C-alpha cells in the first residue's frame, strides 16, 4: 500500500492486536487458578492475514476473545490458506477439525440457499436493519435451525454497511450492457446477475485482483471505498458504481462447531458473544468513518470515474430478484420460512426507517447542500 495514511491505519490496528494480546496474557497471569482449564479455540477465516478491513477485523475479534476471557480461552487464528482454503472453512469447522470460522455465510448457498439471508440479499436490509432482525425479530432462531443441520452454531460478528455496485471495465447504461459480462459476485446477487446474462463466479477476496487484471473477469463487487482502495481494483477497472442492489448490509458470521459450542460454559459463551457483538459494531463503524475519505482518494489520486445505475437497470435487477426469491422459497420449507421472516422484517423495520431516518437524512443533505 503506497498511501501513507493507509499504512498508519494498518499499523494502528496491528498495535491494537498486539495490545489486546498483551492484555489477554496479563489477565491469564492474574488468574493462575484457571490456567490449567484453558480452552483452545482454533479459528479459520476466508480472508488473507492482515487483509485491510475484513482480515484485520477477524484478527481483532480473536484478540478480543483472548483479552475478555481473562486467559480461559486461547484463540489460534489461521487466515485463508494457512490451514485450509478460504472456501473450505465451512466443512473444516462442521467436521470439528477447527472450532470456528469467520466468513460471509452467503458463500455457502450451494449447501442451502437460506445462508444468503445471513449475509445479505438483493434489495434487502441495511446493516442496522439486519441486526435488528437477527437479534430481536426471529432471525437468530432461524439461523440456528439452518446451521444446526450442518453441525454449526453461528452468530453475527461484523458488517460492511451498504456496499457499492462494483468495478466495471465498461459503462453499464442499459440491462443489455450486462449480457456476456464476466463478474465476480457471490450470493443471491450473483444469481440475479446470472438471470441478466452475466457469467458469474465466486472468488475469495485474495484472488480477485489477479483475475481482474488478467481479464479473467470484467467486473467485480467487493465492499466499499475504504476496503476497495487497498485492493487496487482501479488498476484494471475505472468505472466504480456507487449504489448496488446486491449487498445493502453484508453481515458476517462467527460459525462454531456445534459440539464445541454445546461444551462451552455459560461464561465462555458470554465471552465469545461479547467479543463478536463488539466487533459487529466496530467493523461497520470503521468503514463508515473512512469511506468518504477513501472515495476521494480513488477519484482524485487514481482517476476513478463514479457512475450510478439508471432506473432501467435497477428495474431489471428488481424483476430478476423477484424470480430469485421465489425460486429460493421453493427450495424447502426452511428456505421459505427464512425468506418470509426476512421479507416481513424488511417491510416492518425498513418501512419505519423510510419515514423517519431516511426522510430526515434526505432533507438534511438537501438543506446542507450535501447532494
Each predicted region: which residue ranges?
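N-terminal secretory/targeting leader peptides
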Residues: 7, 12-29, 36-130, 145-371
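Core domains of carbohydrate- and sulfate-ester-processing enzymes
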Residues: 138-141
Amino acid at each position: 500500500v503506497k498511501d501513507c495514511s493507509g499504512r498508519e491505519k494498518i499499523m494502528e490496528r496491528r498495535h491494537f492486536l498486539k495490545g489486546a494480546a498483551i492484555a489477554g496474557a496479563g489477565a491469564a497471569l492474574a488468574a493462575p487458578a484457571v490456567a490449567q482449564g484453558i480452552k483452545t479455540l482454533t479459528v479459520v477465516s476466508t480472508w488473507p492475514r492482515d487483509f485491510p478491513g475484513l482480515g484485520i477485523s477477524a484478527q481483532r475479534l480473536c484478540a478480543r476473545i483472548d483479552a475478555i476471557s481473562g486467559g480461559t480461552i486461547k484463540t489460534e487464528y489461521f487466515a485463508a490458506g494457512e490451514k485450509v482454503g478460504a472456501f473450505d472453512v465451512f466443512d473444516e469447522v462442521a467436521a470439528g477439525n477447527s472450532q470456528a470460522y469467520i466468513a460471509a455465510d452467503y458463500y455457502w448457498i450451494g449447501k442451502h440457499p437460506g445462508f444468503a439471508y445471513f449475509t445479505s440479499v438483493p434489495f434487502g436490509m441495511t446493516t442496522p436493519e439486519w441486526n435488528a432482525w437477527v437479534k430481536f425479530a426471529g432471525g437468530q432462531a432461524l439461523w440456528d435451525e439452518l446451521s444446526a443441520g450442518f453441525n454449526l452454531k453461528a452468530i453475527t460478528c461484523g458488517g460492511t454497511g451498504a456496499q457499492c455496485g462494483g468495478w466495471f471495465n465498461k459503462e453499464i447504461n442499459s440491462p443489455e450492457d450486462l449480457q456476456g459480462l464476466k463478474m465476480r459476485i457471490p450470493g443471491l446477487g450473483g444469481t440475479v446477475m446470472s438471470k441478466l446474462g452475466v457469467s458469474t463466479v465466486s472468488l475469495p477476496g485474495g484472488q480477485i485482483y489477479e483475475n481482474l487484471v488478467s481479464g479473467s473477469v470484467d467486473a467485480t463487487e467487493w465492499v466499499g471505498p475504504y476496503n476497495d482502495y487497498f485492493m487496487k481494483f482501479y488498476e484494471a477497472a475505472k468505472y466504480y458504481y456507487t449504489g448496488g442492489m446486491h449487498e445493502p448490509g453484508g453481515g458476517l458470521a462467527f460459525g462454531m462447531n456445534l459440539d464445541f459450542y454445546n461444551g462451552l460454559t455459560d461464561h465462555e459463551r458470554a465471552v465469545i458473544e461479547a467479543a463478536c457483538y463488539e466487533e459487529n459494531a466496530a467493523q461497520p463503524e470503521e468503514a463508515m468513518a473512512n469511506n468518504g475519505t477513501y472515495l476521494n482518494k480513488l477519484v482524485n489520486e487514481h482517476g476513478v470515474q463514479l457512475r450510478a445505475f439508471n432506473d432501467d437497470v435497477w428495474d431489471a435487477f428488481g424483476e430478476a430478484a423477484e424470480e430469485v426469491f421465489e425460486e429460493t422459497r421453493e427450495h424447502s420449507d426452511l428456505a421459505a420460512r427464512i425468506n418470509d421472516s426476512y421479507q416481513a422484517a424488511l417491510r416492518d423495520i425498513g418501512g419505519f426507517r423510510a419515514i423517519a431516518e431516511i426522510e430526515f437524512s434526505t432533507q438534511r443533505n438537501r438543506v446542507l447542500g450535501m447532494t
